[in-house]
Amino acid sequence: MPKRILQGVVVSDKNEKTIVVNVERRFQDPLLKKIVRRSKKYHAHDENKSAKVGDIVKIRECKPVSKLKKWEVFTDEA
């Protein structure tokens, strides 16, 4: 099974080697036929501490690094 890759904006980089990425998805509501935006935050492992708040990054699934971190930084610029 291929690893999932998501793109989002870094909202926090205060932790050591961890960033929080806000990923937004858009879909059409089946009943109202209206475009709806939903967002979710993911904790991602950033080994080089290269991502800063406001950067657009791509993250990919990996084996669990800790309780919350199951994603890693794939590329810094999307």
UniProtKB/Swiss-Prot annotation:
Single GO cellular component term: cytosolic small ribosomal subunit
GO molecular function: rRNA binding; structural constituent of ribosome
GO-annotated biological processes: translation
Keyword vocabulary terms for this entry: Ribonucleoprotein, Ribosomal protein, RNA-binding, rRNA-binding
Free-text function comment from the UniProt entry: One of the primary rRNA binding proteins, it binds specifically to the 5'-end of 16S ribosomal RNA.
PANTHER family: 40S RIBOSOMAL PROTEIN S11 FAMILY MEMBER, SMALL RIBOSOMAL SUBUNIT PROTEIN US17M
Family classification: Belongs to the universal ribosomal protein uS17 family.
Subunit organization: Part of the 30S ribosomal subunit.
Protein name: Small ribosomal subunit protein uS17
Name of the encoding gene: rpsQ
